[in-house]
Amino acid sequence: MVRNLLDPRPPIPAAYRTDERVAIQQLARDFAMNKVLPIANRLDPERGLIPPSIRSEMGRLGFFGVMIPEKYDGLGLGVFEYALVAEELARAWMSVASIIARSGLAASLDPSQRAIYMPLAARGEWLGAFAMSEPDAGSDIASIRTRAEKVADGWLLNGQKMWCTFADQANCIVVVARNQPYDPAHRHAGIRQFALHKEPGAFPKGLSGNPIRKIGYHGWHTFELSFDDCFVPDDCLVGYETAIADDDDGFKRTAAGMTTPRIHTAARSIGLARGALEDAIGYVQQRQQFGRPIADFQVTRFKIAHMAADVEACRALMYQVAANADAGESSETHAAMVKYLAAEMSERVTSEALQLHGGAGYTTDLPIERYWRDARLTKIFEGTSEIMLRLVSDSLLPPTPLR
């Protein structure tokens, strides 16, 4: 009897399926598997960078402009389609799935600047970086110390930033800084966002950067940044009018802008896990031990079953949260839930897939170790798993005095 085997790459559920979504998912899948995966397998082990040709083709296919409005030459689609594309790209190389977020920073600029930069961003010709974390300020955004001092016609930035990925190649770095001294009694006050425009491949006067050596997330560099009287013009204070009127504007902007990135991280986590699952399904049917494929042994079959169920469950929640966001029912709590569950699942599934590969999985000859290394990061960036649990619990329980 011939059975139809479950495809680890299931179609979009009927409740969410449209011809447009099917088309963009297939477009991203074909590009990821045919163009990105072979390059990732070659470049990641040697810590090579994403080739400009890949970025150019991504721009031509519209992947940078998925959520950019059509009036700015984007596709004008939603979070759901963005998640579809991210999952497919992450299945091949998470760094490529991450770079599509770099165009979204153009939306944070003021209207006059959006009109200039968003059409470029939609084509992948203008990409940004985000400088928020500091040596002593990670999950606790309100504890940042980088200062913005008002001078004639602009601001001088001074301080340190950590974990600024793509800072060297970006056209603009959005910097989170304070325009007043840190006050423990008013921790959120005085936080602002500044758009520091720059030439790709260089740092402007007053800014220097040192690459951070990472165990994964290769394909681009992540920097520690030092600001030393780095000048930013007045019109590059993000949300100038509201920022002047509202002392908490910068903190609100930073915190409110995390829902879509967390859905994006869930999609990347699912893509990594799916890649590991697909590779494991193929490997266990080929690998022979004790005179038979290891896929014949129940322990192997149950591992595969658990992995597949985990991936499917997280994808289902991601679809729901993304669809709700597009319907104007965005929920910080549900975004935190899906980010937490998908990241934890991704580390677990990629680890199990590596286990099924045995010693071969612990080499750079196969991509499984890349999925495993990159999955570990999803529990840290865009809010750690612990912070996600804090957000969810705070929405379910009365406030705690430990705030």
Features from the language model and the residues they span:
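Glycine-rich phosphate/cofactor-binding loops in nucleotide/flavin-utilizing enzymes
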Residues: V2-P13, L84-V85, A101, D247, ...
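Glycine-rich beta->alpha junctions and the first turn(s) of the following alpha-helix
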Residues: I12-E20, I24, A97, L207-E312, ...
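C-terminal helix-coil-helix/basic helical segment that borders enzyme active sites and/or dimer interfaces
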Residues: L37-E46, I281, Q285-A295, A308-L341, ...
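Internal helix-loop-helix
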Residues: R60-E125, T165-C172, A325, E329, ...
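A short, Trp-centered hydrophobic/proline-enriched beta-strand micro-motif
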Residues: G124-M132, V175-V176
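A structural signal for short hydrophobic beta-strand segments in well-ordered beta-sheet cores
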Residues: T146-E149
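A short core secondary-structure module
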Residues: N158-L207
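Glycine-rich phosphate/pyrophosphate-binding beta-alpha loops
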Residues: M162-D168, G216-Y217, T260-P261, L377-T384
